[in-house]
Structures are given as C-alpha cells and as structure tokens.
Amino acid sequence: MSHVPGKLGAEYYRSFLNRQGRDCYDHILEQLNKKDYSGVSSSVAIRDISSAASDCFAAYKAVRDDHPEFFFLGFQSEFTRIGHKGILRYPILYSEDIIERVQYQVRKSVCQLVRGTAGLPVIEREILVYERIAKKLSYNNHGDVRDHNIVGPVLYNDGVCEGYNALLMLCFRRIGIPCVKVYGKTKTDGWHCWTVAWINGEPVHCDVTWDSPDEEAGIVWFNYLNLSAKQISVNHYEFSGKEVPACVSERFNYHRYKGLSVNSTAELIDRMEQDLTASAQSLLHLNYCPKQNDPMSEVKSAFKKSRLFGSISIHTCADLNNVLIVRKL
C-alpha cells in the first residue's frame, strides 16, 4: 500500500482492520472525540464471536498508532463479551484536568515548531520542522509512560523513539504532510519506531530519533530524512509487510535534494573550497558516493590538498557514507 493515505494518515491502520475491527475502532474514536475518558467502550456490536476479542484488540492498537494526540491511552486493553455485545476496557493514564492541560501545551508546542512554514514548498516545510524537533529533544528513557507519548517531548523536551515520533507526526500533519508510524528493529536499539511520510505523493522513511544532534557537534545530520527502504535497511530492519508502504524513491533524500553528493576526490576538494570559505558557511553536509573508499580518510586527504587553512572536525555516518565537516575558523 503506497498510495497517499486519506486524512493525512490519521486512519491509516484502520484501513487494515476487518469490518468488525473497523466498527470497534470507530466506536472508540467517537468516544474519545467526545472527550469521554471513562476508558470503557461498551455496546460494541459483535458480528463474529470467534474473532471478537482479537479484532477489538487490533482496533485499539490501531487507534493508538494512528492518533498520537491520544497520548493518554495506556498500552493494554481488556475485552469481555455479553451475548453479541462487547465491552473493551483500556487504561486512561491521566485525569481529565491533566489531559486538558497537556493538550493546551501540545497545541502551543506544535504551533511554535511549525511557525514560518506556511509559504514554503512541502519539502522545505518538512526539513525545517524536522530540524527543529531534532534540536529540541534529547533522548532519555526515564522508565515512564511519558517517554513513549507526547508528554515527555512537550513538557520535558525528551523521550524515546515513540515520543519523538509522536511529536513529528503531529507537526507533519499540521503542515499538511501525510504520515504514519512504522515499527521495526535496529542493530543497536532493538525494537524501534519511526515515521513514513509522503512528500509530493511519494512515501519515504524519516527517523528523527536517529538524527538527534550528538553532544560533540550539536548539529542535525539529516542522515535519516526521506530515505528509501533500501537506504534505511542498512541499519533498520524487520519493518517490511503489507502495512508498511513501499518506499522506493531516493530523490527527496536530504543530501540528494540539496545537491550534496560528491563522486570523486576532485569534486570533494571543489565543494570544500567552495563552501568552507571564511565568508561562507563553516559546516558542510556531504554524501561521498564512492563506496570503496573510507570517507574519513578521503576528507582528510582532500583538506590537505585544498587551499583551505585552519582545521576541521569530521563526523561520519559510515552506514550511509555521509560526512559532516565542521571548519574551525
């Protein structure tokens, strides 16, 4: 499924439910939109008794995955059946008063993060918001539910991948970019989640958690913005399946879109001399295309051969052959 989802992706996982699951999904959604925080969806019509429980559990998970604005929903749910009526119970993590207070802060935070994007092309809107979120948040796992929903990122400026993802999805949808949550694994963190967004109709992978600035450089890398499935699979895996859009385009990848790819040492020297001058910027993002060469060694060699003076610090993303060069003036 790679077509652009309706409602900016807000009912994406609903589309994979069977009829009974969709009925339960709609029932839960109607209650939550009416600010019913009882944590009980009663009188759910049962069409197929044999799959009633699993369908309702799937519906609840789909609601949570589709709607990061429902940050107050807990993880587990409980289903009971009386005849052809089902009752789904789920935990509400906060009181109604706290929910309303957090909702106000969420609206305020999202407005701040998307400010100034209205007149920009879609991809420039995306880049600006992505960078702001990456700079705003720090990765911290406090062992609390706030790390996994919007509360940690909005109130404390930190969280884990689910928190990062929730804020990114809310902001993307606010600026008109369809997006959905994707689950998978990584080589370093085990289970992980990130975003698939549709840029000009094409689905791409975005992992803002992995683009958090490192403490040394303090600069957003954009390594994981708008990747194809092939590109992100160098260190993300077990994310393929019928529910995950087929992301094949690489033309919106940050480095390609910005014209930051170099194919030889000569090109590398030219780009460094052109962009790392005293009168221009002091940092340079590059994708070094020759896979057989070590980017770190190539940059060091190119700097020595160039007409630049001073010193540089070099940061590499070996998996994607990306280089961040910071010139110390």
Predicted regions and their residues:
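Structured core of small recognition/catalytic domains
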Residues: 160, 168, 312-316
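Secondary-structure boundary elements
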Residues: 96-153
